[in-house]
Amino acid sequence: MDFNELKNTDKDIYGIIEEEWERQKNGIELIASENFTSKSVMEAMGSFLTNKYAEGYPGKRYYGGCYIVDKAEDLARDRMKKLFNAEHVNVQPHSGSQANMAVYMSVLKPGDTVLGMSLNHGGHLTHGSKVSFSGKLYNFVSYGLNSDTEIIDYDEMRELALKHKPKMIVSGASAYPRKIDFKKIREICDEVGAYMMVDMAHIAGIIAAGRHESPVPYADFVTTTTHKTLRGPRGGAIICKEKYGAALDKTIFPGIQGGPLMHIIAAKAVCFGEALKDEYKEYIDQIIKNAKVFGEELVKYGFRLVSGGTDNHLLLVDLTNKNITGKDLEELLDKVNITVNKNAIPFDKLKPNVTSGIRVGTPAVTTRGFKEEEMKKVAYFINKAVENREGDLSAIKREVIELCEAFPLYE
């Protein structure tokens, strides 16, 4: 990227950007919710479109001069509809959390009962956590995983639904490595007369590529982010049945947002366009292959995987038998240029800011070009760091940097 102007006008921010670039360039990025966008996506985000205010929707704006940016939003909507075979979409949400809020506020009233996946078992803050708006505005009841299989307990979900008669059942997760049975959830929703909402933020790209069953035919509402596996700009989007479209659009604007971010919407259009290409399916296939091999290698080194493995892009690693917390391993790996995040495991006895596990994912390293052999090396680096946690880590760090140099970013 050309930062010549910024370098001259704001050396402080330029310096911070350069520092972050060095970190990304020389580090192995394993945070499951992160990815590296294409240069095309970044160019759209940094374009003249950032200058345009466009409250409202294409053809129905509250500002003049929107006839060009209307084309960008129409293109983003059309591409998203094609990608997910959707009836109605809205590409204006600023984030995944905003998308979830919009769905809730379009069909629920404060105090309504909602069923959502427990944050401690892999759900998301906006699926009913007491510290989130969702848990404060609505009466969320949590379902979780079966303690033996560490798979979603659909029997418990049904029992809770029959008992509490929720207005909505929310599925989708932020730390769940297995496939989700959307058909079964639809059946439970129908049995109790509940709306079905799916937050597919983490697996949207996998669904777009046809490597996970799509929730779109089953759900009333589907929300997503556009980064993560979709590899687009940071933002949100919503799919719904046509009959809910008008109410949903009105909830987003003027309900919870003002002007949309037209430069981000254009970048969303770019990422949807990229995801419609055949090579994107190959990319998603490699993400899944990399995750499986990565998991198998970690198991060889004695790490335990929650549920025993993965069907998607992420792994939840139980560190209990390694006598190290998620917090400590996150900090340890930072020292060797490997980035992970501490994460609670199901039925975790440690605090959320300590945790007994880490969450790792393969979208970013796959974008970088890593394949199965590189993932074996990454597992080796992690195990070596754990074994030498009290010793000199400089040799591991050098090996990590050498691997990154063999797979340069944005070149």
Curated annotation (Swiss-Prot):
Its cofactor is pyridoxal 5'-phosphate. One of its GO terms (cellular component) is cytosol. The record marks H227 as: Plays an important role in substrate specificity. The keyword Plastid does not apply. Its EC number is 2.1.2.1. Keywords: Amino-acid biosynthesis, Cytoplasm, One-carbon metabolism, Pyridoxal phosphate, Transferase. It is found in: Cytoplasm. The modification N6-(pyridoxal phosphate)lysine is found at K228. It holds the Pfam family SHMT. It catalyses: (6R)-5,10-methylene-5,6,7,8-tetrahydrofolate + glycine + H2O = (6S)-5,6,7,8-tetrahydrofolate + L-serine. One of its GO terms (biological process) is tetrahydrofolate interconversion. Pathway: One-carbon metabolism; tetrahydrofolate interconversion; Amino-acid biosynthesis; glycine biosynthesis; glycine from L-serine: step 1/1. One of its GO terms (molecular function) is glycine hydroxymethyltransferase activity. Homodimer. HAMAP family: SHMT (MF_00051). Belongs to the SHMT family. Catalyzes the reversible interconversion of serine and glycine with tetrahydrofolate (THF) serving as the one-carbon carrier. This reaction serves as the major source of one-carbon groups required for the biosynthesis of purines, thymidylate, methionine, and other important biomolecules. Also exhibits THF-independent aldolase activity toward beta-hydroxyamino acids, producing glycine and aldehydes, via a retro-aldol mechanism. This is Serine hydroxymethyltransferase.
